[in-house]
Structure formats: C-alpha cells, structure tokens
C-alpha cells in the first residue's frame, strides 16, 4: 500500500498559482493556464479556471483584460505590493474614523461623569444608556487594536527604497565585522604557530576552523 497522498488546501493551491504568475512575469490566455499550471503547480486542470476566477473576483490578485475574442490574464509582483499599500491606507483611514468616534463618545461620557454616574442621561434632545456606551467604547477600542496590528503587519512586509537601503547598510556593517573577526583568527593562528610551534592544521582541526573562510559578495 502506497503512502497516503497529502491533501493540498485551497489557499495553498492559490498561493502556487500566484507564485507561478509572479515568477514567469508573462501574459496568458485560459488554455495556456490550463496547460501550464497543472505541470508547474501540481493542480488538476479541471479546477484551474475556477481557481483563477476566484483569485480575480474574490481575492483581486489576478488581472484580466479582454483582447479581441480572448481574455488575457496576468499578475506581477508590484501589483501585490500596491494592493498591500492600498489596504494599509484603507486601514489607516478606518482607524482615524474610529478615533473620531471615540472622541465623540468620550465627550459624552465625560459629561455623564460630571453629572453623576446615572445609568441613563440626556444630552441635547438625545437619550443615552451609560452601560451601552461603555460597551460600545470597549468594542471600538478592540477594533482599533485589531486594525493597528493588521497595519503593522502590512507595513512590516512592505519594502520601500529607504528600508532596502537601511538593510543594505546593516549587511555591509556585519560584513566588515566578520572580515575583521576572520583576520584576527588568522593572526592568532600565526601567533600560536610562531610562539608555541603549533601547526596551523592542528589548531584549525582542534577548534573547527576552516582552511579558508567564505567570501561574501558586495551588496
């Protein structure tokens, strides 16, 4: 009896299709997709069309345009990054709206506290329930926290020019530090050889030091 075949989730199938599009950087018609995706992604050709349509209608990660009498499909990496950026901007806007709501409810709550902790009170022509307002305030705060966490996740994976440059600089500093360390090791081996007549090969073997250190390319 052969090994049990592992089930691939719907999301994993979509991820494989997305990687296929972004790695090839090419435009396709549906017949080409139904031929290439099963080979590259291990997905049944019977469901390729439905999955691609879901990624257009529901996920919005694949683009489609009618060209003559056929549809052309594509998805480039910059489109995905732009979608993440748009999502972060939308979350920022919603957070700002919620903050405005909180400020309004806080003013109403402060008025309530100033006149005593009554369960029900009136501001202008409108009546309010203190417990209901406190519950709504808590829900809004929880929503802000949730959206803020989502925004932080999105911004943490979005690389702009400044972030790329910063990471390059950090890598350069680490490379310089590594080069100094390897130079010091070579100097120490030479010192032990001259001072105590210990063979370099013996020292390297004893401490697990390679004959040559790996060279790092410039970034």
UniProtKB/Swiss-Prot annotation:
Coiled coil: 88-181
Molecular function (Gene Ontology), one example: double-stranded DNA binding
BP term (GO), one: reciprocal meiotic recombination
Localization: Nucleus
Signal peptide: none
Matches recorded under InterPro entries: LZ3wCH, Mnd1, Mnd1_HTH
Keywords linked to the UniProt accession: Coiled coil, DNA recombination, DNA-binding, Meiosis, Nucleus
Keyword match Coiled coil: yes
The keyword Membrane appears for this protein: no
Assigned GO CC terms: condensed nuclear chromosome; DNA recombinase auxiliary factor complex; nucleus
Highest rank taxon of the organism: Eukaryota
Function: Required for proper homologous chromosome pairing and efficient cross-over and intragenic recombination during meiosis. Stimulates DMC1-dependent homologous strand assimilation, which is required for the resolution of meiotic double-strand breaks.
Protein family: Belongs to the MND1 family.
Subunit structure comment from the entry: Heterodimer with HOP2. MND1-HOP2 binds preferentially to dsDNA.
Descriptive protein name: Meiotic nuclear division protein 1
Organism: Saccharomyces cerevisiae (strain ATCC 204508 / S288c)
């Amino acid at each position: 009896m052969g090994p049990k075949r592992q089930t691939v989730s719907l999301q994993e199938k979509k991820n494989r299709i997305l990687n296929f599009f972004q790695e090839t950087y090419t435009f396709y018609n549906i017949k080409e997709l139904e031929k290439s995706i099963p080979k590259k992604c291990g997905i049944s050709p019977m469901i390729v069309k439905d999955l691609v349509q879901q990624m257009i209608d529901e996920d919005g990660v694949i683009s489609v345009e009618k060209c003559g009498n056929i549809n052309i499909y594509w998805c480039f990496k910059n489109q995905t990054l732009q979608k993440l950026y748009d999502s972060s901007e939308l979350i920022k806007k919603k957070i700002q709206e919620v903050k405005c709501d909180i400020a309004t409810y806080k003013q109403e709550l402060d008025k309530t506290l100033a006149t005593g902790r009554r369960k029900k009170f009136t501001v202008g022509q409108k009546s309010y329930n203190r417990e209901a307002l406190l519950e709504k305030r808590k829900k809004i705060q929880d929503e802000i926290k949730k959206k803020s966490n989502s925004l932080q996740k999105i911004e943490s994976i979005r690389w702009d020019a400044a972030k790329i440059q910063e990471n390059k600089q950090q890598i350069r500093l680490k490379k310089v530090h590594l080069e100094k360390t390897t130079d010091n090791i070579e100097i120490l081996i030479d010192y032990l050889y001259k001072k105590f007549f210990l063979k370099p090969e013996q020292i390297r073997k004893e401490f697990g030091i390679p004959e040559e250190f790996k060279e790092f390319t410039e970034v």
